[in-house]
């Protein structure tokens, strides 16, 4: 049996980490939303053996245990005593190591897909709890849409859909290792964004209010290493974005626009600065 699961990219409208736990894991306080840039994950179950095979059309993606989609299949296979193998083929549209959650979204897609193909009957909450063993973004990616994410990534509160908005994504030519950024965190020196204010603006459908309080506590760490992030933000604002911010640990920057015509102008302008530029919309 086989099916295809859509694996949308995510952006962080707000990202804060107020402290870390004794085991070193970060405590997160984030507002995330899915956008209509997505990978497509084809999942085929195999009855002749238990091997897990991962393939993709990206030369930058590992196809072994380092791949989060592989880990998701192995986790379900091991936890539930499944005697079947899996072929996973990923059509990559989301840039790799970009701060857009592509790997986590692929893993979440495998969890959802195999839950169906193997008739496991797991709830999304149960899938999210399993996903936390893979990566802190996987629980959110199981649900998708717009959500408030707390804890180690497992506390997901769905939010109302965003007010009408368009998003321009621009990824510079660098790739960022998330662990290398997290290791640099000095909690006493972080600037904490107004997550409560962002949640209030979303509830009130106030896009200008959202733009005024958006923030990413990790942006200065990545931008210090890769100054092109700041340059991209400046260019987006120059071309007319209502707000511009780094997503995740970077390096992708997104510009939020309240009007489609303005977003198109930002998109056209940014194509002269970055090879990977996308004009997308938040998923409803």
Swiss-Prot record:
It is an enzyme of class 2 (transferase). It comes from the Bacteria. GO terms for biological process: isopentenyl diphosphate biosynthetic process, methylerythritol 4-phosphate pathway; terpenoid biosynthetic process. Signal peptide: none annotated. Keywords: ATP-binding, Isoprene biosynthesis, Kinase, Nucleotide-binding, Transferase. Its EC number is 2.7.1.148. ATP binds at residues 95-105. NCBIfam families: ispE. This is 4-diphosphocytidyl-2-C-methyl-D-erythritol kinase.
């Amino acid at each position: 049996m086989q099916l295809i699961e859509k694996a949308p990219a995510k952006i962080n409208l707000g990202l804060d980490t107020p402290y870390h736990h004794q085991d070193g894991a970060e405590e997160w306080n984030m507002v995330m939303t899915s956008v209509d840039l997505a990978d497509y994950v084809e999942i085929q179950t195999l009855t002749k053996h238990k091997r897990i095979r991962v393939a993709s059309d990206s030369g930058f993606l590992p196809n072994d245990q380092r791949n989060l989609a592989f880990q998701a299949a192995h986790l379900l296979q091991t936890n539930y005593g499944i005697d079947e193998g899996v072929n996973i083929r990923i059509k990559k549209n989301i840039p790799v190591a970009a701060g857009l959650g592509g790997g986590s979204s692929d893993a979440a897609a495998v969890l959802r897909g195999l839950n169906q193909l193997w008739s496991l009957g797991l709830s999304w909450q149960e899938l999210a709890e399993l996903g936390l063993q893979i990566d802190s973004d996987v629980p959110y990616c199981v649900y998708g849409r717009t959500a408030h994410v707390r804890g180690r990534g497992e506390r997901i509160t769905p939010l109302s859909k965003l007010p009408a908005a368009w998003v321009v994504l621009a990824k510079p030519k660098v790739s960022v290792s998330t662990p290398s950024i997290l290791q640099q965190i000095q909690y006493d020196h972080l600037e904490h964004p107004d997550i409560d204010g962002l949640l209030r603006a979303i509830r009130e459908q106030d896009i200008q209010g959202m733009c005024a309080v958006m923030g990413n506590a990790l942006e200065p760490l990545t931008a210090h290493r890769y100054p092109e992030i700041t340059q991209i933000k400046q260019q987006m604002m120059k071309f007319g974005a209502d707000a511009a911010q780094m997503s995740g640990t970077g390096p992708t920057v997104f510009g939020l626009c309240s009007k489609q015509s303005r977003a198109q102008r930002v998109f056209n302008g940014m194509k002269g600065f970055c090879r990977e530029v996308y004009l997308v919309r938040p998923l409803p």
